[in-house]
């Protein structure tokens, strides 16, 4: 295939001619369309040249007179000079035209899959592109030179971080607005929904769990309701266990004072060794079961009375 050298062009620009696409290198192959155009131009030039060398009308008329009307001394007759008719074969196939050649070349290009492999200047990347027809030349930088996988990944990561920061800022402002509205009672119809979230976060913070309101945004309302219901049940169960635990501590203090009164000095300090945490670990579930069987509910008044009585029993000798 004939190659046409062109001037040196920078590798970071894709060189394209109108209505055709070429590989971005220095040598360009002549396509079938260009070959058909050149053939048509050559045929037109040949026809013009042949038309220019045809004899003038005077020469043609004199030649006809000489052939049809010979001199008197010529032995030939007119009939002998008349040319015999030539038999021609008519071909129905239309002669090749420029438009037909273009259609044939386009169909051939559509059937063939042409791939042009472009090697970048630094031989770092190989780009495989399919030739396509474009109506406008472009100056887009070559992918083989500009495309950097690591750089694009870093840019995408930075963009994700920026989007997360924007989203977190928006959510924090919304949470602040919700908190102020609840605080001043401006949106009572939403107070219950947001109070559940705040109660969940407060319960998590009391137990040393790093949870924020933003973390609950991924949960649906049904999930928030189930979490809040579970926490409420656990809280009521814990209150019942605290009531039974306070009763046990008061009884242990009274028994300790009675044994000390009877002379058992070794029992001294028993009430200080038994704390609410130990009771909760050892017999916490049993305390909850006992409270449930006795029908002891979450009574704030009873819990406060038992708490005060526990403090006084530890300090005052009843017996």
UniProtKB/Swiss-Prot annotation:
Principal location listed in the UniProt entry: host cell
Coiled-coil intervals: 146-173
Short name of any one Pfam family annotated for the protein: Pox_A11
Induction note: Expressed in the late phase of the viral replicative cycle.
Domain of life: Viruses
Keyword set, alphabetical order: Coiled coil, Host cytoplasm, Late protein, Phosphoprotein
Function according to Swiss-Prot or TrEMBL: Required for viral crescent formation early during virus morphogenesis.
Known partners and oligomeric status: Homomultimer. Interacts with OPG160.
Protein name (record): Protein OPG137
Organism: Variola virus (isolate Human/India/Ind3/1967)
Gene (UniProt): OPG137
